[in-house]
Regions:
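Active-site glycine- and acidic-residue-rich loops that bind
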Residues: 23-28, 49-59, 84-91
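A structural alpha-helix within SAM-dependent methyltransferase catalytic domains
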Residues: 1-7, 34, 38, 65, ...
């Protein structure tokens, strides 16, 4: 019903996020999310991939992106495995960006991180330490790292 309403209301896309199994049993991997989008069948429901969750659930970042394809990939969080500064941890960003380029995705890539000083959110997301001196530092360094990786693709 929500997807139908969004479609009737205007050019509204709903993106469903794949979240790791420690937080939910619903839509943990890209394959499940694409199936969900197809089952809804309205054409305005897409997949939201999040690197933090992907590193826990997907066997391959590139295969997850290719499973979505341009048709179903609608939004991306480019964050690190610990939700810290992108490009400083375990996420295979080069592989991820190559796959994104291959499918022709041209939507948003958003850094998502959390500051432990925002206690309610930090507690809900299990963030117990700082990843940078300020949120600005995290964003600036993360963006610089991601741009450097993207330049190699």
């Amino acid at each position: 019903e929500v997807a139908e309403y969004a479609k009737e209301t205007g050019d509204v896309t709903i993106c469903v996020e794949c979240v790791n199994r420690f937080e939910t049993h619903f839509l943990n991997i890209a394959e499940d999310a694409v199936k969900f989008c197809k089952d809804v069948g309205t054409g305005n429901v897409k997949v939201h991939l999040d690197c933090f969750h992907m590193i826990r659930e997907e066997k391959s970042f590139s295969e997850a992106v290719k499973t979505c394809g341009k048709q179903y990939l609608g939004y991306v969080h480019v964050n690190e495995n610990d939700r810290g500064i992108p490009g400083t941890g375990l996420v295979p960003f080069k592989e991820f960006f190559e796959a994104i380029k291959e499918i022709g995705y041209d939507g948003p890539l958003v850094i998502e991180s959390f500051d432990p000083s925002f206690e309610e959110l930090a507690g809900n997301c299990a963030i117990w330490r700082s990843f940078a001196k300020t949120g600005e530092e995290l964003a600036v360094k993360g963006l610089a790292n991601l741009k450097a990786i993207a330049e190699t693709v």
